[in-house]
Structures are given as C-alpha cells and as structure tokens.
C-alpha cells in the first residue's frame, strides 16, 4: 500500500536423474521378500570438472513372515507378522547453489545506484558428496481378540554418513556458515504403537491408542581431525549447538558457573557475584528430546463423536534467550525474592574461600548480579519436557432423515481445536516447541512465538 514498491526475483532449478529396479518374491502367501536398487544423480552436486561424485547407488531388502497364516495360534491371536529389513537412502544438497557462489543485484545500494552482491550466507564447497543413511529394522505386528487389540513394535539401528550440513563459520569471513559433509551419526531406538477397541455397541464406541518412541543417538565421527563441529549459536554467543565425538547428537556446549566439589556455585568474596568458568565450556544439555509420548482416544454416541490427541516429549533441554533477557532485565519472577527486592536476597552457593554465604545482595547490586548471569549460558538452560493437548474435536453427523429432499447425501459438522493447552510444561514463559531452529540446531530459543492455538469449524458435505 506504499507509494514506492519494490520487488525481488530469484530462480531455483534442480533435478534428480534416477535408475531404479525392484524384485518381489512370495512363498505360499505367507513369506514375502522385496529387494530394490536405485542410483540417483543430483544436479545440486554437479559441477564442471568436479572430482567428487555427484551420484550414489543404494539398495534395500525387506522380509516379512505372516506366521498366523501357517501356524495355529489359538483363538486369542488374530494376526501375527514378523518383519525385518535393511535399507539405504542417499540425498544431495538442498540448494542448487551449494557448490559455487551466486550473485545478485542490490537496488539503490549507493547514491541510488545498484550494487552487485553475493547471494546467500553459506560458503560453498565443491567437494560435497551425497550423504547416505543405512538402517536395519526389525518389527512385529500382533493383533488379538478379533483385532480389538493391536500392537506394532519396531526396533531400528541406523547411521547417517556424510550428512550435508552448514557448520558455523567465522564472522570475519563475511559468511554465517560453511557447507560440509558431517562424518557419522548413529541412531537406535524403539517405536511402539498400541491400539484398542475398548467398547462397542450399536449406539456407543470407544477406541484408544498409545504411542511411544525412544531414540539413542551418538556422534561417531565428525571430520578428519575428530574435532568438534559447531552448528549454530544464540545471539548471546555464549553457547553453541555442537557435535562432539562420543556424545549424543546436538550437545548444548556453553559457558558455565564455577562450582565446588559438591556442585554449589562459587561466588566472589567482594560483591557476592557468581563466578563464570573461564576458558572452558562444557555440555549443558542436549537439544533433541530422546523420548516422545502420545495418547489418543475417540468416542461415538449415536450421531455425536469426539476425539482427543495428547502429545509430549521428554529428556531434552533448551537454551531460552527469552528467559535470559528476562533475568538480565529483572523481569523474571526469580529476580523478585519472597520478601521483595528491597530486603535483598541471599544467593544459593558458597564463597570463594568455601564458606557459606551469610550476607544478602542489596537492591542496589542486584542489577549487576543478574547482568553477570546473562553471560553464563548455564543460567538459561531448562528442561524442555512437555505434554499438551494437541487436538480436540467434537462432531455431529446429521441424520439422513434431515437430509431427505436435499442434494446432500451426508453432512458432518465438527468443532476442532489444536494446541489448546499444556498439561505440563517444564519451561518458564515459553513454548518449548518455539525453538527457532528445529533442524541441526535444535535446542535454541530466542523470543520465539508460541505454537498458535487454533479453533475452527469444519463442515463436510458429500453429494
């Protein structure tokens, strides 16, 4: 709506050429074997005179045995299938400009004249190769009591070789990151889904489901030197999401307090301010939660129906820039002692000489105290566990008698709410799902907007 309007134009084009083959075998309709092979050529990894390969050949094999078709398992077991498989997956860079610099024009950059510039903030890498993921998986599909109860369990073990990521680059380079193949990341875990039909009559039905996943990750290798790889950092620059050999994926590696052997924070003798650990960072947590939980239930009574879905994660941590700023500026509830700021407060910990803290921090010094803690990443680390009502719906199926004489065969009206509220949330003042980067840099939050709560009306008509 402004008088002078500007515009921009960008052009992206990428292509994957593939050769694919598969074969399927069956034995007496209860044993099945499938094998595949595929070769992909990625345009995003292709460059004239490039020595590193731009393609990858990967295969897979899966075997399933429907034991309930060849064994008498009694009346209790309705269906039983065992499955196992090995698979490989390959991929290229997302951007078609990952291998070379791209240039653009910045309008009215100097005295009204256009200026040329380098587009993008990532240093290209001509030696990037396709990443590869290898996985072994075993599972069981069990259904019981005339399919009223089903259990689907899976164990997996995989490794990702040469993942294509943007690692942190020195600010003096003029770029924010550099493209690289990350060494070797392993993941193993279990997935469990249980479904049950609890009750069913002509007028009433009640179904429920529970799902659980747990993943164990490890950084097996990073680069040729085995050094740490930094992925991202908050604007406070006192912490980095770092891949460290032998540790779990996505370590929050940052500044911390000096502590005594008992774990108490050590404070300066002169003014009682906590002492930061100089010259060394440590692992303060891990941004990727290893465990996910879910519960769903649906009900039907005559023409009315309702459903609820509850989801949550546990075991992860998050660096909250929002809370770091609230503490620094005195807006966090922890900066207000029970007796008020005027009465001062006594920090938890010990003095440099090992003695207990007996004097309080007066109001005039409290600002200095909390401004010091802002520079220490450990202060803003929180557990990111949560459980929330992801979706709740209530619906009504309009009886066919009410639709007689109309052009509508079936009508359903539903009221649906998503992300309604938390049942539990271990973070202060933020939504743990509002981390500003959920990719290779999960675990960082910086004034992130919460996941929106939405309530809507859905009308479904069939003609």
State the predicted function of each range.
Residues 102, 133, 169, 174, ...:
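Short capping/connector residues at structural and topological boundaries
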Residues 105-112, 257-268, 370-375:
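Short low-complexity stretches enriched in small and charged residues
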Residues 121, 278-279, 289-290, 377:
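Flexible glycine/proline-enriched surface loops and loop-helix/loop-strand junctions
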Residues 42, 313-412, 417:
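Extracytoplasmic gating/loop element in the C-terminal half of outer-membrane beta-barrel translocons
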Residues 1-243, 295, 312, 376-463:
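Extracellular/periplasmic, surface-exposed regions of secreted and cell-surface proteins
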Residues 286-321:
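Glycine-rich, aromatic-lined ligand/substrate-binding cores of catalytic
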Residues 180, 186, 197-287, 318, ...:
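Conserved small-residue
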